[in-house]
Amino acid sequence: MTSLPLVRPTLLVLALLPLCACPPPSPPPPPAEVVVRPAGEAGRWFAADIDAGRALELVGFLDRRFREPGNAPYRESLDEVESRLRGAGFGADDRLTLERWTLDEDAPTWEPLAASLEVVSPEVETLQSFSAADDRERTMLLIGSPGTAGSLEVDLVRDGEADPKGRAVLARGMPEAEYGRLAEAGASVALFGADARVEGRVSDDGAIPFGSVAAGDWGPVALRLSRATERRLRDLLATGKPVVLRVAASVRVERGPVEMLHAEVRGGPLPGLVVAAHLDEPGAEDNASGVAVAAALAELFGRGIRDGGAPAPNRSLHFVVGPEIAHAEETASRLRGTVGWAIALDQVGRPRGPQSSPHPTRALVERAPDPSQRWRADIGPGSGWMAGGDADEATWSRAAPSLLADVLVALLGGADRGWESHPFEGGSDHVPFLAAGVPSALVWKFPDPTYHTSLDRIGPSVVSSDELAEVGRGCAAMLASLGWEDGATVARAAAAPWETRAGVVAALTPGAAAACAWGRWLEQAADELETMLGAACTASPATAAALAEILGAATRLGDECLRSTIGSGRGGRRGGGA
């Protein structure tokens, strides 16, 4: 941040100084005790919906910038988010605090400026290029790649078929794994295509995946190719004629701090809530969409306190944006022992469907490790992002049981709106919170045919304001219920699936193992929810009733576990779990 210029005060200002010397009145302190208000009461101070149009504008701002931790576009993006939050009242007083946390004081930063890949021989042909930060093919230059001094003209060879020294190599495998080998061999240019075994399906022959290499000044220029470009180069090599390429790349490599933002609505003694979204990576959906919703949620509650007269919440609300994983690790560390639940927003704006597609986009909440990793019951299948498999109880028992994922599915719209949870896979900002013992869940959309490619740019088929609004509405309902109300909205959402799920679990084969595992898990998850709800569990009849429903389902599963264990196995099970 830049400092304001020093301005010489006028005599008038000097004369008024004694009148202004007193500090402004302090805001009231957060409540020392929990104030239980009925469901819906927060509507007096807060809108139900985020400003989705404004959120979409932020997606557009971020989309035009290739955001790598600490580089100039990243800093501009962080400045923009900070400006929006300050405009909503954060940083003005102790009720709404705003700070930057430094993750690394002197980190190397990297920014792509321009690149081009041309065929010189046998005939001149431009294959891929970009000359501005918001050009479509900006992902062709692998993150971390060095640039060139002017342009290089080099012979093209296939990996493993000729000496790579001083040449452009059409490489095998993934850049993260193979770049170092090619650098050691003296290649001048390393060309990598899409690898469907690792990156999944790419929807368009012109899509250029993005990736990264651990490069230094000594390594070859590293480029990603679309399938169309890779096919063209292979066809040229197949003719047997020499193929000469012209390659140019311009990058900005600097050193500087890597920072993140932490905005807090300061509240009372109950366990806090975190909304996290990573700011880095160049995509509109991944993850300008998550940052936009997180910022819009912070603005909604900030304005309600500053302008709407809302009291401090019963618990603190934290909104954090920064580099993926690293900013979540920092938050989990700094707030250790004060946070009850964390939500990661990562790829939340893509419209679901189309159902005619062989791999339609789904609206998903990823669960923490739990028995769904072995017995899904009525929980959805894996996302397809990472191959899942059975896990035993030793795997999921390390995670604190929590009903957070069920709460989010219900408040986001449930099955009626196409929302479902799926077993744990990992790979996003919920993982550091789980590692710190904080129940957390990932809200996201997948499969995504633009994922990690040049196609992930703002447009109605990639990021929809309606989708941003829906995610914002569900998250806001949870934050309002737990922050200002009796938690009944959250408790009812947690209980909603278990009336039927308990029966589904009891009917599974082998029923004893499933019922025992889910029964133990649900009982512990109910205890964890009771801790989150605090005084509302006894002060609010609606909250207490919903919690009793959950405990009733746990009891039914426990009974089924006992019957199946001491009975005759199959003959002793009752499919209804009654």
Segments from the language model and where they lie:
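Acidic, Ser/Thr-rich low-complexity intrinsically disordered segments
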Residues: 488-567
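Extracellular/luminal Protease-associated
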Residues: 60, 72, 129-224, 286, ...
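Noncatalytic luminal/extracellular "stalk/propeptide" segments of secretory-pathway proteins
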Residues: 32, 36, 41, 48, ...
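His/Asp/Glu-rich mid-to-C-terminal helical/loop segments that flank catalytic regions of hydrolases
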Residues: 449-501
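Soluble metallo-hydrolase cores and metallopeptidase-like ectodomains found primarily
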Residues: 135-158, 210-286, 296-308
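Bacterial signal peptide processing site
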Residues: 23-25
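Short helix-loop-beta-strand segments that form the rim/entrance of peptidase-like active sites
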Residues: 300-330, 338
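Metal-dependent peptidase/peptidase-like ectodomains
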Residues: 50, 147, 268-270, 322-442, ...
